[in-house]
Amino acid sequence: MDPTLISLGALALAGAAATVSGCAEDLESDVGSQSNPNSQVQLGPQMGNIHRYFNKAISGEPVSYGLYVAVAGTIAWALINAGLNVVLAIIVGAGVAAIVHGAYSVSAFLGRTVGQSKKFGQPVYMDVLTSHIGPIVGHGFIAVFTMTLAAYLATTALGNPFPLPLVSLIFGITVGAIGSSTGDVHYGAEREYQKYPFGGGIPVANQGDIDIYAEYGVRNGLDSSYFCSRFGGPLTGLCFGLIIFLDGWRSILGNIIGGDLVTKTSIALLVGLLVVAVAAVINRKLEVYARNKYGPYRN
């Protein structure tokens, strides 16, 4: 079979895996309230809002997912070199990473909540711990498995020269950064502040004054994940999937058109710059259109 067709198929599969990974990563952080929105959850009890959110800011998402995917990639790499089937090796690696993820989540939830119990009256709800840890670990497993699969495809079919553990680390940091900057806005700026007018941002005076009641009953992290699965999660997946796909596509295009190594590299760089320029123009047009159509925010 033509090597170019194999590369295109591997790239399509890696892009699909990255899309699923980005979506699962964002929804996991919504269940556990990690990264940017967690500061608002942490401030909630200090503002008199006793809540039932799962509070687990282990670290920023880029750092934590860099760790999880690197653990999975390292274990998978060792097992593959030992002769184990590739899919089984990635599953085992993602399973170990899920256990690490769960251990950090439990310790972070208990530690951060207990730290606020005496002074601000925030209880440790054990049912919140038991009901949220499953979705956290489950979404995390899906994200890590698909991310490790994309990293494996990058190191084999797509010609990435670096070893699987290093590529896994880089991909984990990337997906965490995208989830933190893209999907978490839907949770932290919208879901946590639905009692305020839409579009007003989060003024300093409102920080920590989060919603503690849902459409029915008291709100928790599972409600947040359900809400964000309609927009924030898919948008994160689409963003990361496009990054993986377009980055691989420019390299493949350079290999097809170019002759020597310098020409291939130059074409790949030019195509990458063209993609960035087109994306910047589209973003600018969209922002101007939205501002002209809806106008400035008015309370």
Swiss-Prot record:
Name used for this protein in its record: Tetrahydromethanopterin S-methyltransferase subunit E
Enzyme Commission no: 7.2.1.4
Transmembrane segments: 57-79, 89-111, 132-154, 164-183, 227-246, 261-283
Primary localization: membrane
GO BP: any one term: one-carbon metabolic process
Family designation: Belongs to the MtrE family.
Reaction(s) catalysed (UniProt annotation): 5-methyl-5,6,7,8-tetrahydromethanopterin + coenzyme M + 2 Na(+)(in) = 5,6,7,8-tetrahydromethanopterin + methyl-coenzyme M + 2 Na(+)(out)
Record membrane topology: Multi-pass membrane protein
